[in-house]
Amino acid sequence: MIKTYDVVIAGGGVIGASIAYHLSRRKDLKIAMIDCKRPGNASRASAGGLWAIGESVGLGCGVIFFRMMSAERKREAQGSAVVVDSSTPHILPDSFFDFALQSNALYPGLHQELKEKHGMDFKFERTGLKYVIYDDEDRLYAEHIVANIPHLAHEVRWLDQAALRESEPSVSHDAKGALEFLCDHQVSPFRLTDAYTEGARQNGVDLFFNTNVTGVLRQGAKVLGVRTDNEGVFHSKTLINAAGAWAAELSVMATDLSIPVAPVKGQIVLTERMPKLLNGCLTTSDCYVAQKDNGEILIGSTTEDKGFDVTTTYPEIAGLVQAA
């Protein structure tokens, strides 16, 4: 069976679903989204943090992984005895800041649009993000952050111990204070993916779940479509690679070139529903904690270079719980 589309999107996570939804606003395009399982598998395991500043200045699991890998490579190059300074944050380029802040600014309007036009609520919450300070090393880390973002001084504020306790009564009394990022908020990651997907469906996008892309149709350097395991052939003018951890594999099929994308294992802890304990998202040098609108508390995240391994391991889970 051959199907013909203007655009085929390979991948139904939050990126693929977002692309599908935004393209579906154009009524002149015939669009298909293909996903190997139900959409949003990895997206559902994320914290849902819209941490435009936090992720850019060395907080959050992505940058934690970068620091971990940088330390490993430095030790490999210079010897296992080398000391890697953990008090200096890895500040991402200004272009990343700008991209993240502009993206964040779209969410209030997007939240309203998906609720009003498509009946989908992805639980956008203006929670802020607090980096909790326990010792001199934490404070030094926070001071490095502030020193590197003078253009965003209006988006951060220092909280002393009394202000932190007033803002977050459940935080340990050992905490000395916090650095708060005022524009960093959160959403429900699986609801966001579902909202994009349902909005795209209502706008006419054809959805193909539990469908694997097994090959790419090519004529020289030109991509003509994809082959799938159970839905036949899709001809398309444009193929969009939104395959997440499998993006490198799809890139080779389409271009003979691999892109530097690899899976990173992340373990999290999700509690049962609890009374409201947190007023905002918290992060430390060891973990981050976010309470969702339904009362569940998410504690994350390990960042492990273990490929597609999805098993849970007690030492890592215990470490997250202890850190929280």
Language-model-derived ranges and their functions:
Residues 92-93, 120-133, 142-203, 224, ...:
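Helix-loop-beta segment of a Rossmann-like dinucleotide-binding subdomain
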Residues 178-238, 246-249:
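Helical element adjacent to the flavin cofactor pocket in flavoenzyme catalytic cores
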Residues 18-25, 42, 48-55, 63-88, ...:
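Active-site substrate-recognition segment that forms the wall
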Residues 30-35, 158:
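Short beta-strand "acidic-cap" motif of Rossmann-like dinucleotide-binding folds
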Residues 5-32:
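N-terminal Rossmann-like FAD-binding beta1-loop-alpha1 element of flavoenzymes
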Residues 49-163:
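Dinucleotide-binding Rossmann-like beta1-alpha1 core, especially the glycine-rich loop
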Residues 157-160, 208-209, 241:
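General beta-strand structural signal in soluble alpha/beta enzymes
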Residues 38-39:
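Helix N-cap at the beta1-alpha1 junction of Rossmann-like dinucleotide-binding domains, i.e.
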